[in-house]
Swiss-Prot record:
Accelerates the degradation of transcripts by removing pyrophosphate from the 5'-end of triphosphorylated RNA, leading to a more labile monophosphorylated state that can stimulate subsequent ribonuclease cleavage. It is an enzyme of class 3 (hydrolase). This is RNA pyrophosphohydrolase. One of its GO terms (biological process) is mRNA catabolic process. The gene is rppH. GO terms for cellular component: cytoplasm.
C-alpha cells in the first residue's frame, strides 16, 4: 500500500531494556543493522501493525508502549535500492514506537516463519544514529530525539546526524 505521495506506511520499533539500551538487529544475509520495522496493512492501525511486526520479526510482543511519535517521519529510498520497479514509490513514512521489553532475553527469537534478522544485541540509546544506513539517518535521529524525554535520556553528543564528522562509534553488548 503506497499513499498518493509515493510513501509506504510503516511502523518502527525502538525496544528498550531496563538499562534503556535499545535492541539493534542485523538484517539476514547483509552487513546491515537496524531497528525492527514493517508495513501497515490495509485497515490496520499503527499499533496493530507494531504488535504484528514484533511477532514476525523478533518472535515476541512482550512489550509495554512507552510512547510514539506525534506524526509521520519520512525517508526516501534511493532508486538503486528499490526491490521492484514501482513508478510511484519514493520511500517510507513511519510512526515510531518506544517500547519497554518485558520478557526474558531467551524469548527474543529471530527464527520466525520468514526471518528478517540473524542476530541482535543491546546497544546504547544513541548509537543507531551513527550506524544506520545514511538515507535512514535523519528519521532515526528524529524518532530517538522525540522519544528520548519519555525515558529521561540526555540529549545526544552531536548536533547534526547527517554530518560525517559528528559520527562516532559506540560499542554495544548483549
Amino acid at each position: 500500500m503506497i499513499d498518493a505521495d509515493g510513501y509506504r506506511p510503516n511502523v518502527g520499533m525502538i525496544i528498550c531494556n531496563e538499562q534503556n539500551q535499545v535492541l539493534w538487529a542485523k538484517r539476514r544475509g547483509e552487513n546491515a543493522w537496524q531497528f525492527p520495522q514493517g508495513g501497515i496493512d490495509y485497515a490496520e492501525t499503527p499499533e496493530q501493525a507494531m504488535f504484528r511486526e514484533l511477532e514476525e520479526e523478533v518472535g515476541t510482543a512482550k512489550v509495554c508502549i512507552i510512547g510514539r511519535t506525534r506524526g509521520w517521519l519520512r525517508y526516501e529510498v534511493p532508486c538503486a535500492r528499490h526491490r521492484v520497479s514501482r513508478r510511484r514509490y519514493r520511500g517510507q513514512k513511519q510512526i515510531w514506537f518506544l517500547l519497554r521489553f518485558e520478557g526474558e532475553e531467551a524469548e527474543i527469537n529471530l527464527r520466525t516463519r520468514q526471518p528478517e534478522f540473524e542476530d541482535w544485541r543491546w546497544v546504547d540509546y544513541w548509537m543507531p544514529v551513527n550506524e544506520i544506513i545514511s538515507f535512514k539517518r535523519r528519521v532515526y535521529w528524529q524518532a530517538l530525539q522525540e522519544l528520548a524525554p519519555l525515558i529521561n535520556m540526555n540529549p545526544p553528543p552531536m548536533t547534526d546526524p547527517c554530518r560525517s564528522e559528528n559520527r562516532h562509534p559506540v560499542v554495544g553488548n548483549r
